[in-house]
A protein has these predicted regions:
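Ser/Thr-rich, Pro/Gly/Ala-heavy low-complexity intrinsically disordered linkers and tails
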Residues: 3, 11, 15-69, 161
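N-terminal module-boundary/linker segments of secreted carbohydrate-active enzymes
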Residues: 63-78, 162-192, 382
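Aromatic-rich carbohydrate-binding modules that target alpha-glucans
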Residues: 68-124, 130-159
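Beta-strand-rich binding/interaction modules
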Residues: 88-93, 645-662
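Substrate-binding/active-site clefts of carbohydrate-active enzymes
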Residues: 176-182, 190-387, 404-421, 426-432, ...
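Active-site-proximal helices and loops of the catalytic beta/alpha 8
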Residues: 295, 299, 303, 313, ...
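Asparagine-centered strand-capping/turn motif at beta-strand->loop junctions
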Residues: 639-643
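C-terminal beta-strand-rich structural cap/linker in extracellular carbohydrate-active enzymes
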Residues: 668-684
Length: 684
């Protein structure tokens, strides 16, 4: 299907709707469940070879690109009878409110005035005729309707067509950040860089250094912001770990994990018991002024900041829990046992998942209690007001009553967005740890009332299996992405990724001899504390990981870089996947990957077609995927070869091409793509 950008009046309504919407996964280091800590056991979660009915699978050719109905349009001819007029202009709601003000000039064809324009797919249209530049008229021979303002307009019930035009949401107003342009970097603060040794912490009783604070802080993040480290990668958004104060105690894991951990990760919040506007920050990361300085420094470099917001629970030592225990679900499954997730209560079934305690020391908020909900939402809004952050990463969102999310979005609009000039879109991205059930992820996505997007776990599954592990075909990836592109809605901005803090380091899935076999969702816990893996020696692993990032950096969404993945940092499951960042002594493979990441980031930054617009597959087979991405004024060709031998990309434009990754001259329409390499072209 060919897709075209909205020209002039195109999708004013859709763009306005998007703009108006703005108007612990993770937590403890040992949790074993689908939303917190580590991937599910294969015996519990098995989406099947079909990918859970999400369009993933390859038999035959590549399925067509799927366009959502709200972006579809059909060509339609309007007519008006000639009666001596000198000019007639078609006006109406077919292009949003603007086309009532400036419509489409009609041309006379004998006894009839005619105009052909696109109308929304399957939606009723109201229209009228502006005659001789002075008078509004209807055609009495066509159906009419009286609108809410008592105006009589012509109307028709709507039109469908196949193929339809697939429009694109146009640019946002000047000064409004477009989250489609986001490239995100997850800074795991405690493991990133120690910028101020004076605030280093040590909690007695942990099972080892990897389970304790290691000195990373906000001062270290500020240092790298100032040095331009993130800008060099093409990153314009930082996600930083939970900034809340955590208790200086240890806690045991779950699921049989008897190791003792500190709260270095931030997911054991202590919240003020009396005033939700009194923000208790994590002193091991620095002062509150240091956190505010981090946000200011980032903004000065053109970088947005998200904070990880932990809203599922508090730590049992929190004074808030002592003062308001009725704001939390009792640890009682009603069957004579505890309601611990996975032990007496279900992680996934309702209502258990919205009330079970992740561990015996993490009481679960009861947001069906209005007082509890209001207190928590007010606290969240205060973090925005007092720090100036631009969004939230919503932790383990499926464990939260939806009323909390609805109220938060409403309060963000009234308390934050409405007071900005110009109003910005406050970006909220959720974490729902599910590789197969896209409907669950989608149920929390609606930029006007809920999340802007989620981390795309189902895409991660197919991406890793196709590009890194090579257990499915590149045509499978093309098929999946064609059906996934707008699955979560036209206005959603999903965050695409290959690695995060709950999965083993992804470099090991790209190795010639993969750790954990064919299971992309392995938790890697078998080597978290002993026999910890070293960095792969072969260049091939780093080339494959670069290819995975090439897919992310040349397609829609907000690509995520988990700290250290840009250098192939090794590590097994949690907590070994949270090693301290390596800043010196990089080997040649690590330098290659980091340099390639910089190049991909800059290419994405320079070409809007890679961030929005449409994708059309030229060819896709077992090892090679060639596609074009197009938006107004920009067309880019991408060829990704995951195979271990050279492949020929066909169907590229004839003549000289600029190759953007290596700068090597190329001539189309046929170009050789080296083994395990991605090439990005523009026609000269």
């Amino acid at each position: 299907m060919n897709l075209s950008r909205v020209l002039g009046i195109g999708l004013t309504t859709a763009a306005a709707a998007w703009f108006a919407s703005s108007s612990v996964a993770c937590g403890t280091d040992s949790v074993n469940n689908k939303d917190y800590g580590q991937p599910p056991d294969a015996g519990i979660f098995n989406p099947g070879s079909s990918g859970g009915g999400d369009g993933y699978g390859s038999s035959g050719g590549v399925a067509p690109f799927v366009c959502p109905d709200e972006l579809k349009a059909c060509s339609h001819e309007f007519t008006y009878p000639f009666a001596g007029e000198t000019s007639v202009e078609l006006r109406g709601d077919f292009g949003g409110p603007d086309t009532w003000q400036a419509g489409v000039p009609m041309k006379r064809d004998g006894a009839v005035w005619k105009a052909t324009t696109n109308v929304p797919f399957g939606k009723p249209v109201q229209f009228k005729f502006y005659v001789n530049g002075a008078e509004w008229k209807v055609d009495p021979a066509q159906p009419t309707v009286t609108d809410a303002s008592s105006n009589t307009n012509n109307t028709f019930a709507g039109k469908t067509c196949e193929p339809a035009v697939c429009n694109e949401i146009g640019p946002l107003p000047t000064g409004v950040f477009d989250w489609r342009d986001s490239v995100m970097y997850f800074v795991f603060v405690d493991r990133f860089l120690d910028g101020n040794g004076a605030n280093n912490c040590n909690v007695a009783g942990t099972s080892g250094p990897i389970a304790n604070y290691q000195g990373g802080d906000w001062a270290g993040v500020r240092q790298k912001i100032t040095e331009g480290y993130f800008n060099d990668l093409g990153v314009n958004t930082l996600w930083i770990t939970v900034p809340f104060n955590n208790p200086d105690v240890t806690g045991q894991g779950v699921g049989g994990d008897t190791h003792q951990y500190s709260g270095y990760h931030g997911y054991w919040p202590k919240i003020d018991a009396n005033d939700p506007a009194s923000l208790a920050h994590e002193g091991c990361f620095g002062s509150f002024a240091e956190l505010k300085g981090l946000v200011d420094d980032a903004h000065a470099k053109g970088i947005k900041v998200l904070i990880d917001y932990a809203m599922v629970h508090v730590h049992s030592s929190s004074a808030l829990f002592s003062a308001h225990s009725d704001w939390f679900w009792p640890n009682n499954n009603g069957k004579g046992g505890n309601c611990i997730c996975g032990e007496g209560c279900s992680w996934d079934a309702m209502p258990d998942r919205e009330r079970c305690w992740f561990t015996g020391y993490l009481p679960h908020w009861n947001y069906t209690n209005p007082a509890a909900r209001d207190y928590s939402v007010t606290n969240a809004v205060e973090w925005v007001k007092q720090t100036g952050v631009d969004g939230f990463r919503a932790d383990a969102i499926k464990h939260v009553d939806i009323s909390w999310l609805n109220e938060l979005r409403s309060r963000i609009k009234t308390d934050i967005t409405a007071k900005q000039t110009p109003p910005q879109r406050f970006y909220m991205v959720g974490e729902t740890y599910d590789f197969g059930n896209r409907d669950v992820l989608k149920s929390y996505v609606d930029p006007s009332t809920k999340l802007d997007g989620q981390f795309d776990f189902p895409l991660r599954k197919v991406l890793v299996e196709s590009v890194l592990m090579r257990t499915v075909k590149m045509s499978d990836l093309a098929n999946f992405m064609n059906g996934n592109e707008y699955f979560y809605g036209a206005n959603a901005v999903m965050s695409t990724f290959v690695g995060n803090h709950d999965l083993p380091r992804v470099i090991h899935l790209a190795a010639n001899s993969r750790l954990w076999g064919d299971n992309q969702a392995s938790d890697g816990k078998d080597r978290s504390w002993a026999n910890q893996p070293t960095i792969p020696a072969e260049r091939e692993a780093f080339e494959r990981l670069a290819n995975a990032f090439a897919v992310l950096m040349t397609n829609r969404g907000a690509p995520l870089i988990y700290y250290g993945d840009e250098i192939g940092l090794p590590g097994a499951g949690d907590p070994d996947n949270r090693r301290f960042m390596q800043w010196t002594g990089l080997n040649g493979n690590q330098t290659f990957l980091r340099d390639r990441m910089k190049k991909l980031g800059k290419i994405r930054e320079a070409h809007p077609a890679l961030r929005r617009g449409s994708r059309s597959t030229i060819t896709a087979d077992d090892d090679l995927w060639v596609y074009t991405r197009t938006t107004t004024g920009d067309t880019v060709y991408v060829a990704i070869n995951r195979g271990d031998g050279d492949k020929t990309a066909t169907g590229l434009p004839g003549g000289s091409l600029d190759e953007l990754v290596t700068g090597t001259p190329a001539t189309g329409p046929n170009v050789t793509i080296p083994a395990r390499q991605a090439r990005i072209f523009v026609a000269k």
